[in-house]
Amino acid sequence: MRREIIDIKLGSLWFIVGGNFASMRYLGADMFLLRHGQSYFNLHFNQSGVDPGIKDPELTPFGIAQAAAAATTLATSKLTRILVSPYTRALQTVEPIRALYDLPVDVLHEVRERAAFTCDVGSTPDVLATRFPQHDFAHLPRQWWHEGTEPLEATIARANNFRSLMSTRTDSDTTLLVSHWAFLLALTGVSLENAEIMEYDPASPAPPKMAPYA
């Protein structure tokens, strides 16, 4: 397993971060997984431990810089397919990667975060289409996120379905998924930091059952 350290100048500060700034985990694997960059929910919740009550939060300036760094890390990955969750924080994270590769992006609500906090209340497809006109949201249900707290078993089932689907494809090694902490944990058994990239073999067995956290 290798972790890359990336330094980037943001404003007047230098960030030299290993575990949470576009670092990479290698498991000798296939497709690329990327957790979204730091959102305003992450910023406030990590400081206070209290849900700040922000629905569908945007990325912070640091999160935007993390997304740009992730794009740089993935620049030589020869991506042919990009999948992304419909949450704003994921759509903002994917933007510099989409621009780099000039690829259409498939927006999939099946890879969304496990609903447990206010940040997991999403935006309707019409609102998303206004914010991100470069993407197609017409296929999404009006309320594509889970109402209230999603049962852990439902999150695991979504992850298992996605793993099964990707294991049958021949392009998994050039596919990127931009998703969220709990979904990626259910998929891989690994807790990823904001903007951390992981290579993952979708033919791997399902990880041990997640412990409830909310």
Predicted regions and their residues:
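Basic polycationic patches enriched in arginine
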Residues: 2-3
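Acidic, low-complexity terminal tails and accessory targeting/binding regions
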Residues: 11-30, 114-134, 170-173, 185-214
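Active-site-proximal alpha-helix that buttresses catalytic centers in soluble enzyme cores
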Residues: 26-30, 34-107, 129-131, 156, ...
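Short active-site segment of divalent metal-dependent hydrolases/proteases
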Residues: 39, 183-184
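Phosphate-handling substructures
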Residues: 43-44, 48, 53-58, 100-160, ...
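A generic secondary-structure signal
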Residues: 69-73, 161-168
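Glycine-rich phosphate-binding loop signature in dinucleotide/nucleotide-binding domains
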Residues: 76-78, 166-173
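Short, well-ordered beta-to-alpha junction loops that form the rim of enzyme active sites
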Residues: 84-88, 110-111, 178-182
